[in-house]
Amino acid sequence: MPGDSFCIQYTNCTGCPKNVENILVYRNLPKGEHIPKDKCTQNCMLFMIKGELLINSEEHPGITLRERQIVLQAIGSKVEILALTDVEYVVYWFNELPLLCEERYKEMMEQAEAPLTYTPLIMSERLYHLVTSMPEFLAEENPCSKYIDLKCKELVFLITNFY
């Protein structure tokens, strides 16, 4: 098999109408890197793989995010990030989560309550395994949109069924 790509090397995905950019993003920041406060134009979930990241937002004021932790930032949130150590994380950007199971969604909406304080969630073993398998593929120049769609659905499935 030529190369280490998940897709066939002879397919050019750049012109594909289903090319999905920046839905899943892998970030690798060196210690001290600062991302100034910026307004989220979409909802996002940040999945920490390695290191410590200081997040400052209305929902998470001064929270240090560590390996295996997740936070959700809503559309309109203003978020500032500082890498306290070398960090690796994956961000999932979305307007609406894909609806995988309508019954489960309705059950969650009936039971959901706004938290008094926002704290990071801890990734389950399955979710951590999924997230840590993504960086190599996401680092490719043009990751396959069908693969990204599948991984997004898998993320949502694991989150809605285990949290």
Predicted regions and their residues:
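N-proximal short alpha-helices
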Residues: 11-21, 44-45, 121, 128
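Amphipathic alpha-helical segments enriched in hydrophobic/aromatic residues interleaved with Lys/Arg
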Residues: 104-159
